Amino acid sequence: METIRLNKAEFNNVLQMASQMAGVSKTLPILDNVHLRIKDGTLQITSSDSEVTITKGYQLLYNTSEDCDIIFNPKSLCALLPIIADDEIDVENNGSDILVKYTNGDMSLPTFDVDDFPILDLDAQNAKSVTIEDCAGFAETIKDASSFIANDYIRPIMTAIVVHIAESGIEIYASDANILYFSKFSDKGNQDEKFILLPAKAIKPIYSLLKYSSDKSFTLLYNDTHAKFVCDGGSVTTRIMEGKYPNVKSVIPQTSKTDIVFDKKTVQDAIKRVSLSTNESKLGVFSINFDEAEISAGDADFRKVSKEVVEANIQTGQSLRIGFNLQKLSRAISVIEGPKITMCANDKDTATLWHNSDDNHTLVLVMPMRIE
């Protein structure tokens, strides 16, 4: 085989991204490897665990007259490429191994039978599709949602992130039963309604593909069993989780008696400091009155008590005393963008809704804790 010259940085970026699913499967040893294909001047690398497959490719700078199909374990090469100084490397396929050459040395890696490598894909001709604007925004939204999936083996459906496609738009949500993350991501959807339940392990590959894409939009293909995200010379195909996700929209309060505006950073910092005195329950109490809120916590066993006062602007309603798990509340607030956040509440025993004070497209519902 002829020697193929590759730009090291470009090849390394593609290899690192595309090899994410290699070694995830514990049942098929062949899936410890990646599939590298060169065809018609395009290099493409694929890894899979049989349920999630990521593929990334790019157009080669140097023309090659020879196509290539090889399977190899990427672990050593992923470690080598970032620590060699060369701008370019040479790759030779010798049949039973590949030889990667750089200025001061080389690395030989065994190759395996291409036919043994299973590829998970989706038949585009029999799939529905929707074009979604803002690759990076979608990536950040599913990353935020992934912070609130449940770790629940009894109800595995709650470990999913839901992408709800409807004619009215696209919604993304997830819940661990204590916190609900809900984003009205787009007003443009598809007339064929679909609830796509993404498994947690698909989120990182999808995020990597979309976040660093040079494309502004991506295509989402889907059928009853699979979803495929396509952009910028790459794709992630994942099995869709089976089952029916709870109707989370039914628990989102439509009205509130008390709306309170906080400075996000101020309240985050106060929660962080007060949390140092909580007991195992992580209970903290917000006592809101007029134009301020006292955040307090204590641990009677160790005689620790902390409290801080922060500015609070009551937009509607009146004073309120309500308890939260401060650790979970801090996590909920962290995914809300903007300098000001609003808490919408009805009483100390029902769910509160938190959102950007200037935008309610992203809502985080937080359940309170009982206080005496």
Residue positions per predicted region:
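Structural preference for solvent-exposed beta-strand-turn elements
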Residues: 1-372
